[in-house]
Amino acid sequence: MSLAGIRVLELAAVGSGEGRPSTASGIAVAWVAKLFGDLGADVIRVESADGDDRVRSRPHELHRWLTTNKRSIRHRLDEPIDALLGDADLVVHDGSWPELAPELVTAAWPGLVALAVTPFGQTGPYHDYAAEELSVIHGSSWGFLSPSAATDIALPPLKAAGHHATINVATAAAAAAAAAVDHATRTGQGEHIDFSMYAAAAKLTEFAPAAASFLGVDASRLGTKTVVPWGIFECADGLVSIICPEQEQWESLVELMGNPEWASLDAVATQPARRENADLVGIYLGEWLATQSVDELAVQAQHARVCITPVTTMAQLDANDHLNARGFFATAPDGTRQLGPGYKLDQPWWALGSAAPALGEHDGETWHPRADLPGHGLDGERPSARKTGQASRPLEGVRVCDFTWIWAGPFATQYLAHLGAEVIKIESPERPCLFRRFPFHPPGLEDHIDGSGSFQIYNTDKLSLGVNVRDPRGREIIE
């Protein structure tokens, strides 16, 4: 939806509280506000008057990406921000502002949504610990699992360069904030969101929690992966990533390779056998892949329904035909070529309307009138809070048909369910979700399709409807 008319206050400056602000939380706050600004919200970025900024100080001019579609005003700690808070719909901060304690916000601005993005949350024994991207990665166990299938126990775990964990978890924070803001605009009831980057990152560790809670096994980056083949291989002109979690995908890959003699060996006939002989599979598969062209193989694999994709370099990404055809790259008003959204909308709500502002470029300004904002803005002010007997979750009344499976889709729809939506998972009785079939059952529990931990961790809070979509009667039910 368009967010035109929504007012977002981004507190980039560090407050006067005793918290331990970090670069990670500063970038997370900036990313949340950017996501709102890119969809039309009126975003005011409150920055430190002395120029001490955790985004502006980052290399490679990161701020020119994270501060687009925002206005910048300078702030001194002895100056109140009540006027801006009073007319804001959402304030995003790093937990260092005492005036944004939950009880104070509720009393002074009952319709305001306040999102505190901190490394460990605002309660608990770790709440005042200093932390950065490295801490979030390794504290959540994400780093401990990387790189997967490592062979040398003496080598340390790794993290990807940059701020991948921060951007990922901050996107989840923005989704929660968007739902809360929508709820507040309808009911007048604000919300305090205590968002823990640490907890959100732990949610993304996929099978590790299921292995611990369902199997009593500590997941590790060492040893053989559960699925073989699964990894990055060299081709004649670049790299590809390949994974074959299902037997039929392996059989399609064998056919794609021309049914080589080695593929008929009992040692590679089944998934357990391939896992037992992973080195052998890697040698044979690597020899064949070394003769293939990345682009040609990727197309052939798509037709064969085999999961093979190019491993793209930065230069290749910039020149990628698919991304350019979809208009992924966008040009800001200052001429910089920037990354666009990962989605396409029917309506032109996403836009790079303004370049990154200079520090204090908009000093003295306040909120734009809601009616003057482009798009479908809100008319009038925030509604008065309505008293109800029981607090409602923001997406109650929303119904979602979930046709996804495996991981990414179920994770997204589960998030909607946690926020109150009624999510109905449409499933095939003939071919259940792969995660239902994974062997993640607690000791002593029969191998049942409803008992796999890999399915449970991403599908709680949902309803399930088994439908044969190939049958006209099944399609009629769905329609």
Spans of features found by a protein language model:
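N-terminal helix-loop segment corresponding to the beta1-alpha1 unit
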Residues: 1-186, 362-479
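Short, well-ordered beta-strand elements within core beta-sheets of diverse protein domains
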Residues: 9-12, 238-245, 282-292, 308-311, ...
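Aromatic-enriched alpha-helical interface/lid elements that frame and gate functional surfaces
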Residues: 90, 215, 228-304, 308
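Glycine-rich beta-alpha junction loops
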Residues: 119-121, 197-203, 237, 245-248, ...
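Conserved Rossmann-fold dehydrogenase catalytic segment
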Residues: 122, 154-163, 185-199, 220-225, ...
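Substrate-binding/catalytic subdomain of NAD(P)-dependent oxidoreductase enzymes
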Residues: 180-220, 297, 314
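Short Gly/Pro-enriched turn/cap motifs at secondary-structure boundaries
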Residues: 220-225, 230-231, 333-336, 356-359, ...
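A glycine-rich dinucleotide-binding beta-alpha-beta segment and adjacent secondary-structure elements
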Residues: 303-353
